[in-house]
Amino acid sequence: MIGRIYGTGSYVPNRIVDNNELSKYVDTNDTWIRERTGIARRHVIEEETTSFMAVQAAKKALLQSEVKPEEIDLILVATSSSETIFPCTACIVQSEIGAVHAVGYDINAACTGFVLAFQTAQAYIDARIYKTALVIGADSMTNLVDWTDRSTCILFGDGAGAVLLRAEEGKPCLMAAHSDGTKANALTGMSRHHKAVTSLEDKITYVHMDGQAVFKFAVRKVPEIIEELLADASLGVEEIDYFILHQANKRIIEAVAKRLRLDLTKFPMNLEEYANTSGASIPILLDEMKRNQRFQRGDKVVLAGFGAGLSWAACMFEW
Ligand code: UT7
């Protein structure tokens, strides 16, 4: 069984902060940010919350799929920046959309979260436990970054994306995933009110990242996991139509394409507009591509996420 994508939706805040505006807050400039990351601007929450954005994206996915909220069995929200620790964001979404028969929970795996949530939903569907699943990625990273740290605050934006999956007979989704907790310190985030009592306090408050370590990890592990995933199905990378990677940095995506010896046109990007929206980046891009009718039935699509944990995951399905 496969969970076929029946509908997608996304939401980004109206407030746009471009690189020039950022240069008023920290010592940076548009040229540096564009050259090192490919980012030109980001959408930043004002009154919005993570759950508000998740609900808006979910409503659009529902509308597009023509599925009734009461038909949904499962709601998964990939987020590491929910405004409440509990209740989980998925239960807030359930209430707001009226998905009265669904069970909902959040998956916190930072930028890898959406791919892991998508895999979880696919596994439930393939096991015939649930038929209809709503998978959302939603994050308000600008709430967690230190706006005085130029090495991290320039990278992130806010948003949410959702996909509505329905069970159909078909080739199951291929999946691979890994974590390496020994490298956890390369990318950490604490809530704003966290009172750390260790000597590392200053370093681990807000988002703290060893940018180069994360960059090297991504460039090595993403091609590796894609090859691992496809080898299991005896597929070559050239048979894949689209590689939809977590939108962290244009140079990471270019390096992955180069390592796989593939044309960059197979690697759609929208990070210039939204920056790194963590768990939301892949579903926002999926929604944009679907609305622009970029997918044909039968297209082979790879999703790949990577980030804090450190963790990385990939999956492949036919559209
Ligand atoms: O979702 C997954 C999460 N994270 C990532 O994917 C991030 C992965 N890493 C990266 O994308 C890159 O490492 C960064 C974009 C964060 C940094 O790029 P880099 O090419 O690794 O730069 P760097 O850290 O080596 O810094 C080069 C220089 C330094 O100055 P010096 O020491 O050479 O004088 C930095 O202080 O650039 C300086 N710098 C900046 N300059 C202007 C660092 N941040 C900025 C800035 N504006 N915002």
Positions of PLM-derived features:
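Conserved beta-ketoacyl condensing-enzyme motif
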Residues: I5-G7, E47-N108, L229-L230, L235-I253, ...
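A contiguous, well-structured pocket-lining segment that forms one wall/lid of small-molecule binding clefts
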Residues: D202-L271
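Acidic, glycine-rich active-site loops and adjacent beta-strand->loop/helix elements
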Residues: Y11, A78-E83, A109-T112, G137-T142, ...
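Condensing-enzyme catalytic core mediating Claisen C-C bond formation in acyl metabolism
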Residues: M1-E47, D149-K216, R220, E224, ...
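Flexible, glycine-rich active-site loops centered on histidine and acidic residues
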Residues: D126-A160
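Buried hydrophobic positions in well-ordered alpha/beta secondary-structure cores of metabolic enzymes
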Residues: I5-G7, I33, A61, I75, ...
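Catalytic phosphate/nucleotide-handling subdomain of diverse soluble enzymes
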Residues: D287-A304, M316-W319
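Conserved catalytic cysteine-centered active-site region
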Residues: R34-R36, A40-F52, T79-A133, K258-L285
